Amino acid sequence: MTTRLTLDEAQARVQQARVGDSGPLSPDEPARPVAVPSLPTCLDIAERLIEDATDVSNKWPLGVHDIDDALGGGLKKRECMIVSGKAHTGKTVLIINAVARNPNNIVMWMTPDEPDLMVLSRILSIRLNKNPRDVYDLAKRGDEQILTAIRHQSETDLRNLRIIDRAAFSKYGEAMRRSGHQVDGPIDIADHMLGTWSEAAYGRKADVFIWDFASQLDDPELGDDPARISALKSLGMRHDAVTIIVHQASRGSANRGAALGIESGRYGGEDLAHFMLTVWRPHEDESLPADERARLENVFGIALVKNKRFDGKKVTINMEITDAGKLLDPWEETVIQYRLDQEEQ
């Protein structure tokens, strides 16, 4: 006896076949309801907005008061920031300072540009407030105090930081392939680290994803920096992470010691970022007299040139950089001086 299907049942069968539902369809089998993915309502998003506004723990501050204030307290998950500047102007210095200030966040720092020893030594120098060369020389001599401090910092305040250089990245990819994972390129490896590995190691996904720097994402299918930045941004957002991408501005003839604008990221995916910072070293401005350049030797310039938060406030600020590589926030220095003055009264 032939079982007749209603129009709705027939349409359901067709839909199941289209989505590749497993198993043969029997005429006698009742039509199964088709699963339809849900989408958030405006009320759902509004509830998250309210929670976001009242929760100060869900923001990743950079440690520069005026910029963090313009960002509403810092960067949030699913947001992407590009840090742009010419070669050797301090792009990584800014991020190192931010990481050193945020020990409670899981940070996956992928650095095909610099070896992990170099990155960690600079972070430790800031944490220990010592010149990187002094830290290295003391460790070389076997100074027990510095060795103890290095190990203590690394297993406590830096326990949530993972630094993955090119060698570690390649070894991880090979291990994935041996385990049967399909690895088509570096994005697949980074995706596994941000999700599967982080959840296994920490019980949750990474809070912050740093890639240093964009042009060293070696994937033949990503032919230029905008394509690379787009892929990295998509990856970070997919894992609900704060995404920070370092981008080296053109090696053109522009003044290395002058403030850079958003055009410094031209053709570098600046239109893809929610926020963009540019950095420079004022003492490299060749138009300044020699004595002025000498005075600016330890000055670090930073500007928030793209800001999609609130009213889009832009910020430009000069900061002092210490021998340890620490950036001194003028706002914090003013507060400290004010408190000292109050104590003297």
What are these regions (language model features)?
Residues 23-130:
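The Walker A/P-loop phosphate-binding site
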Residues 126-130, 213, 217, 235-238, ...:
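Conserved, well-folded catalytic cores of nucleic-acid-processing
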Residues 222-234:
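Conserved Walker B catalytic segment
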Residues 220-224, 256-257:
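Short, solvent-exposed loop/turn segments at secondary-structure boundaries
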Residues 113-114, 212, 241, 245-250, ...:
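A short beta-strand-to-loop transition that corresponds to the Sensor-1 phosphate-sensing loop
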Residues 3-47, 152-159, 170-209, 234, ...:
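C-terminal regions of RecA-like/P-loop NTPase motor modules
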Residues 107, 243, 276-278:
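Short, well-ordered beta-strand core segments
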Residues 13, 105-220:
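Conserved inter-motif catalytic segment of the P-loop NTP-binding fold
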